[in-house]
């Protein structure tokens, strides 16, 4: 099936011509009210499901015509809590190649409060927004071989919204509950995909969301009539276990030359105090310390990191500021014709400030028990960009070494292997460490926003993992 076509698919794709807020939210911005024009009305699909008018709802969710939007896709809102009128926005792209068989991949952005429209337009969706607000095709879109489902999560993120403060998530249980409701509805609207392999993926703060929803699916599948065909998860530069990551910051920043000896000692002292609060479950006190070190959200002053490094960007240690083109999508989403095409009307596009407020105490809590359960039962990919600071590869490995799961001993003994895409490549794509169905990947030349920095390597990685193609280089 897919296997027989794989070398052809890879060859075709690879030969295509080449082209402050919250712990991880400085990349995400709110969209001002749209300019004058017809933005249409928001499309709520839950009433169509409940009325048995699924085909009608599906037809209405088809994304309308817009210059550059040349790939079939579907978008709309799914109501996940009627009491508070809480709704999650999704945008779904069936795979360009064999969509009837292709795995369905849920993508969740970090933040907390980062819109998955960032992943769509900046990282691996089919389109890239240009400076003049037009679209061009991405060179290595994940939608080539995978059916990609982008959801603005949690409620209050991006176009997702609620009418009541009680509708905001305060922990990962809330996040998972709402996502699960949305997924069940999604597969009711698109039943032809319910038996396809399903993967949950995401990056950064979604290192919490991904295990949370995967664990809930794992728990409910045995007792629910409607099952989600979960096959595995993939987490990029994931903030799954804050204590392990925070404990390694000072030494890592010193080793890459961003702190001197004196600054390292101060950073280490603050991180130690933060960890002490975490162990005592003083969540807000731990958040305060971390905020002063890295973000400065709670005060009007720059963070300690910003003061001593002179940089606002901790996503790639070769860059001091975020690339300008990572924000083009924000303005694009304010255009009335775009809003009409994706069925959001005049709904506010939120920057996640409120989401972060309600998840503040969640920020420093770990999802390691859930992640361990998933690692014991499913395929798992944990990947890092070599140039990331905030969730550096060394800090992820620090966390993995402290985990106890069925493959932990095999993982600790596993040899790190060089990974190249093609045998003839002079450049090394990255490094692989594998234990059974667990894969750890470090990609060279990439930072926190990995598919943006290294689109081809990210594309090859996700396809090798999901399609089980191994890590040997292709001949050619």
From Swiss-Prot:
Leader sequence segment: 1-22
Pfam families named in the record: Peptidase_S10
Entry GO CC: extracellular exosome
Annotated tissue distribution: Expressed in macrophages but not in other leukocytes. Abundantly expressed in heart and kidney. Also expressed in spleen, leukocytes, and placenta.
EC class (word): hydrolase
Glycan attachment points: 81, 132, 307, 346
Superkingdom, natural source: Eukaryota
Keyword terms of this UniProt record: Carboxypeptidase, Glycoprotein, Hydrolase, Protease, Signal, Zymogen
GO BP of this protein: proteolysis
SUPFAM superfamilies: alpha/beta-Hydrolases
EC number: 3.4.16.-
Catalytic residues (UniProt): 204, 388, 448
PROSITE patterns xref list: CARBOXYPEPT_SER_SER (PS00131)
Gene Ontology molecular function terms on file: serine-type carboxypeptidase activity
UniProt record similarity statement: Belongs to the peptidase S10 family.
Classification via PANTHER family: SERINE CARBOXYPEPTIDASE CPVL-RELATED, SERINE PROTEASE FAMILY S10 SERINE CARBOXYPEPTIDASE
Function statement: May be involved in the digestion of phagocytosed particles in the lysosome, participation in an inflammatory protease cascade, and trimming of peptides for antigen presentation.
Name of this protein: Probable serine carboxypeptidase CPVL
Gene encoding the protein: CPVL
